[in-house]
């Protein structure tokens, strides 16, 4: 059998007419047997459309693809980013697990940079600065933005942090219009310091601040960062090429996080991720939540044929999580060739999307309940909420449970317009409370789930060449928009340029 895929297809065929209620009835201990607790995180896979026999075949697939060995290679600092010849050591930003010289050196370097970062924060604490503008895009923005928004209610930092990512000048103007330049500092975050959006927005911020005195930078090219904006080297924090942008919030890219929530809370975030790292590395495949989550995604994509995947955050503080995961998953797994350059032989990443409950129930849930597509989903909620509005929290979680149940079980009716077909599989994830530790562990779980999927599909989760061509073409077209004579080959682009130039 083809590395276990053929056996799994037989199981998918066997289960085609089986409903999720059928599975619950056949395996009476399923609600407990398909649940896992990892620190402050609870996972329940009981409403996924597989049984224990199919699940064992999924674990066999993981063994056939040596997922455990792949984890070891990544944590030890081997060059698992094969297309760029790089190690992948975001885990070393938050803990030292492998003990190899490469990983220890990475962990030590990251700790030293954090010390520098905290010293810069102490300097800002002693100043009159009240607001921070963080300029970055993609991995330099989505992770910090998510964490700052999620942990704002328990923040220990005294700074208000504002994020600007879009090259659209309206985004920067909206932020600047509400701030006082004399009480504002800026952080420019770019791995290469060649990102068009960050450079253009950075120039606006530089001019608005009246120079670089209160300007900071984070980059894997610190010399270019310092030179481009005349920033003193002591205000430039380094990152490394072994940290991908979408995995970088644990590094100095997290500077705005530490400013917003405080250094202690930032350390708790790292500790939560490190605890999950240790779990992912050491727990056997059959009990490992990251492995099970990744295998479930493969099952839904390749054997149930689901082309989209939804994330429902039933906590307003996690409203940005679907967008963050959209980048993490789709930029990592949106590949059509394997690591060796040959075409993949099955579908890879589905489209990830989602929203925040209960708002989503009044927008796209109609299509989930009565549309024609089966949409697997992760439902994420919190057990304890520290705000005083307890009735609201009860109502929120009642809706969370109700939607999961109806999407899976459906309901028959004599009126065809009122039939709920059900059949939508889901995973429930509950945080004991939305703490830095729990959020760090949750994000780390998704990182490792993505890696599991990449190993099964034989693709590189750590490059992103697909984003390059469009950026390159945009640079070529920019002079044409300004009226310069530029050869434009595409006839539609040529016609639209005439209209854009007026």
From Swiss-Prot:
EC number: 5.3.1.9
UniProt-annotated catalytic positions: 331, 362, 471
GO terms under cellular component: cytosol
Transmembrane residue ranges: none
UniProt entry keywords in alphabetical sequence: Cytoplasm, Gluconeogenesis, Glycolysis, Isomerase
Name of the protein in its database record: Glucose-6-phosphate isomerase
Described function: Catalyzes the reversible isomerization of glucose-6-phosphate to fructose-6-phosphate.
UniProt catalytic activity: alpha-D-glucose 6-phosphate = beta-D-fructose 6-phosphate
InterPro entries on file: G6P_Isomerase, G6P_Isomerase_C, Phosphoglucose_isomerase_CS, SIS_dom_sf, SIS_PGI_1, SIS_PGI_2
UniProt keyword Transcription regulation present: no
Keyword Isomerase: yes
Primary site of residence: cytoplasm
Pathway connected to this protein: Carbohydrate biosynthesis; gluconeogenesis; Carbohydrate degradation; glycolysis; D-glyceraldehyde 3-phosphate and glycerone phosphate from D-glucose: step 2/4
Pfam families: PGI
Gene Ontology MF term list: carbohydrate derivative binding; glucose-6-phosphate isomerase activity; monosaccharide binding
Top-level lineage group: Bacteria
Family per record: Belongs to the GPI family.
An annotated GO BP: glucose 6-phosphate metabolic process
Enzyme class: isomerase
Source organism (scientific name): Xylella fastidiosa (strain 9a5c)
Compartmental location: Cytoplasm
């Amino acid at each position: 059998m083809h590395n276990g895929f053929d056996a799994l297809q037989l199981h998918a065929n066997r289960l085609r007419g089986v409903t999720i209620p059928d599975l619950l009835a056949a395996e009476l201990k399923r609600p407990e047997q398909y649940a896992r607790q990892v620190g402050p995180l609870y996972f329940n896979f009981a409403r996924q459309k597989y049984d224990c026999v199919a699940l064992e075949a999924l674990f066999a697939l993981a063994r056939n693809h040596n997922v455990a060995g792949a984890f070891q290679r990544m944590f030890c600092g081997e060059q698992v980013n094969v297309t760029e010849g790089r190690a992948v050591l975001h885990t070393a930003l938050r803990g030292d697990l492998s003990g190899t010289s490469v990983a220890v050196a990475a962990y030590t370097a990251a700790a030293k940079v954090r010390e520098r970062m905290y010293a810069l924060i102490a300097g800002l604490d002693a100043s009159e600065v009240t607001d921070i503008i963080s300029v970055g895009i993609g991995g330099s923005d989505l992770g910090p933005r998510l964490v700052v928004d999620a942990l704002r209610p328990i923040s220990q930092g005294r700074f208000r942090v504002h994020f600007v990512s879009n090259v659209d000048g309206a985004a920067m103007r909206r932020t600047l219009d509400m701030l006082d330049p004399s009480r504002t500092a800026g952080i420019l975050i770019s791995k290469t310091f060649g990102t068009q959006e960050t450079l253009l927005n950075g120039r606006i911020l530089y001019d608005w601040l009246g120079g670089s005195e209160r300007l900071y930078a984070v980059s894997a090219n610190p010399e270019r960062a310092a030179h481009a904006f005349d920033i003193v080297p002591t205000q430039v924090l380094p990152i490394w090429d072994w940290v991908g942008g979408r995995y970088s919030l644990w590094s100095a890219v997290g500077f705005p996080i530490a400013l917003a929530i405080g250094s202690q809370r930032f350390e708790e975030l790292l500790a939560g991720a490190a605890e999950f790292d240790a779990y992912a590395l050491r727990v056997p495949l059959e009990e490992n939540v990251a492995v099970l989550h990744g295998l479930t995604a493969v099952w839904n994509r390749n054997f149930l044929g689901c082309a989209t995947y939804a994330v429902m955050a039933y906590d307003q503080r996690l409203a940005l999580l679907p967008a963050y995961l959209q980048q993490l998953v789709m930029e990592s797994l949106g590949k059509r060739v394997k690591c060796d350059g040959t075409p993949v032989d099955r579908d890879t990443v589905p489209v990830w999307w989602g929203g925040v409950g209960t708002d989503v129930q009044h927008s796209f849930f109609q299509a989930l309940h009565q549309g024609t597509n089966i949409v697997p989903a992760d439902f994420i909620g919190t057990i304890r909420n520290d705000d005083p509005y307890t009735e609201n929290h009860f109502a929120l979680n009642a809706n969370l449970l109700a939607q999961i149940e109806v999407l899976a079980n459906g309901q028959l009716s004599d009126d065809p317009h009122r039939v709920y077909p059900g059949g939508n599989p889901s995973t429930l994830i509950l945080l004991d409370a939305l703490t830095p530790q729990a959020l760090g562990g949750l994000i780390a779980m998704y990182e490792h789930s993505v890696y599991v999927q990449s190993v099964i599909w034989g693709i590189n989760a750590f490059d992103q060449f697909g984003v390059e061509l469009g950026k390159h073409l945009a640079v070529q077209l920019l002079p044409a928009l300004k009226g310069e004579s530029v050869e434009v080959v595409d006839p539609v682009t040529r016609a639209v340029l005439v209209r854009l130039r007026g």
